[in-house]
């Protein structure tokens, strides 16, 4: 049964500007520790791909927060949900702390899809009550 849906789109240049103004500190506010490892690896290969990764994760967290009906308010925080890839490449949300408990208490399963193209990053999330979704592996795929 569908519990909620959420979507978000972000202009990549907008995030580039925020990153410049904050001297990169913005990324520390948004990404969880496992996402940060992936971001740094991608950024080392290509500044553009690192920025696109950050933008898709930002959009995913916004879409996820809308799908579960909380928006960006407690227990939903930027770092409480990480979007990690399954070995198949499928993105899977991984919640921690009080957010994980909140989602579990409601029996929610959330699926997230992300995409980016030159100027924009977009994410869509659908939350369902019931059903099972495999948890992402502890060491996410590094694609």
From Swiss-Prot:
Example of a GO cellular component annotation carried by this entry: cytoplasm
Entry binding sites for Mg(2+): 8, 62
Cofactor: Mg(2+)
Record protein name field: Holo-[acyl-carrier-protein] synthase
InterPro entries, sorted: 4-PPantetheinyl_Trfase_dom (IPR008278), 4-PPantetheinyl_Trfase_dom_sf (IPR037143), ACPS (IPR002582), Ppantetheine-prot_Trfase_dom (IPR004568)
Domain of life: Bacteria
Enzyme class name: transferase
Gene Ontology MF terms: holo-[acyl-carrier-protein] synthase activity; magnesium ion binding
Similarity remark: Belongs to the P-Pant transferase superfamily. AcpS family.
Alphabetized Pfam families for the sequence: ACPS
Catalysed reaction, written as an equation: apo-[ACP] + CoA = holo-[ACP] + adenosine 3',5'-bisphosphate + H(+)
Function of the protein: Transfers the 4'-phosphopantetheine moiety from coenzyme A to a Ser of acyl-carrier-protein.
Gene that encodes it: acpS
Keywords, sorted A to Z: Cytoplasm, Fatty acid biosynthesis, Fatty acid metabolism, Lipid biosynthesis, Lipid metabolism, Magnesium, Metal-binding, Transferase
Subcellular location: Cytoplasm
Entry's EC annotation: 2.7.8.7
Single GO biological process annotation from the record: fatty acid biosynthetic process
Organism: Cupriavidus metallidurans (strain ATCC 43123 / DSM 2839 / NBRC 102507 / CH34)
